[in-house]
């Protein structure tokens, strides 16, 4: 497969053992970063996307997988860990998150209430808000199954179940 500049795509690891180890570059963005003196060396990683045939290519992803080198947890194991909390199956408005501060506020109509490690029922609708850095700082537990959920726009993201222990506020409507 090729990206929207015709460069062959490939697997690009971005984070390994909790450290940033790579970037996604289009040819254009790599050249611009070098020209502006922000970095010394960069080449295309086969990661160019376009929003249309008249728009310039930008760096992006077409198939992003969140995985771990550690063994993931089953759904049942994660329920035991949650004890009291919520299972959020999808959110709306994630694109409105502040990329600088990490603050986000999203809504969901697909949320389950968990008490004592068991699902007790659905919440009709809720708002979720918090700060991504705070939500991630106490560690993240990943599920053992990555499920492709389709593609939106020019990219898609495949996520296992993700357990955030703190840093998230749930505001049932």
Predicted segments — roles?
Residues 1-173:
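N-terminal small-residue-enriched
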């Amino acid at each position: 497969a090729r990206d929207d500049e015709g460069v062959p795509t490939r697997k690009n690891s971005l984070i390994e053992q909790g450290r940033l180890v790579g970037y996604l570059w289009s040819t254009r963005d790599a050249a611009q970063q070098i020209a502006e003196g922000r970095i010394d060396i960069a080449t295309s990683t086969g990661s160019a996307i376009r929003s249309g045939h008249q728009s310039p290519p930008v760096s992006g992803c077409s198939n992003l997988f969140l995985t771990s080198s550690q063994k993931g947890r089953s759904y049942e194991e994660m329920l035991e860990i949650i004890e009291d909390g919520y299972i959020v199956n999808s959110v709306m408005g994630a694109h409105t998150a502040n990329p600088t501060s990490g603050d986000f506020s999203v809504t969901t109509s697909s949320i389950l209430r968990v008490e004592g490690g068991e699902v007790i029922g659905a919440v009709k609708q809720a708002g979720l808000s918090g700060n991504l850095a705070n939500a991630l700082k106490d560690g993240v537990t990943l599920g053992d199954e990555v499920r492709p959920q389709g593609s939106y726009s020019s990219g898609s993201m495949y996520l296992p179940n993700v357990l955030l222990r703190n840093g998230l506020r749930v505001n049932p409507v």
